[in-house]
Amino acid sequence: MTPDERHEVWKKLENEYQPFINYDENDTPFHSMGGAWMKKDHIFTTPFYYIDYCLSQICALELWDESNADIKSALEKYNTLCQLGGSDTFLNLIKKSGIESPFNVDVIKSLAFKCSSFLNL
């Protein structure tokens, strides 16, 4: 993706999710052309910042899905994860808790279909 393409995507996202933002093209031409995403310094300084949200969300959706079938089992997994705290790596913690890896494509596909069905999409 070129820088110009990234700027266009950012402009579209801002228009959709933050329509109240109105850049003055004379005062902030860089931002009005879609460059505001570059103000998010953690994109550059902590590149896994946003990925962490995605991984956590997939694990949370796994627990949500399991809770629909067996709330007790889902709560046990969640409690185990909480008790383990930061005692190990992320992948080892979720494995010890009985949660599938969010890197598993089959897990992502399955959750996508289940969420889509739940939302009647």
Q: Residue locations for each model-derived region?
A:
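C-terminal, non-catalytic "cap/extension" segments appended to globular domains
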Residues: 1-121
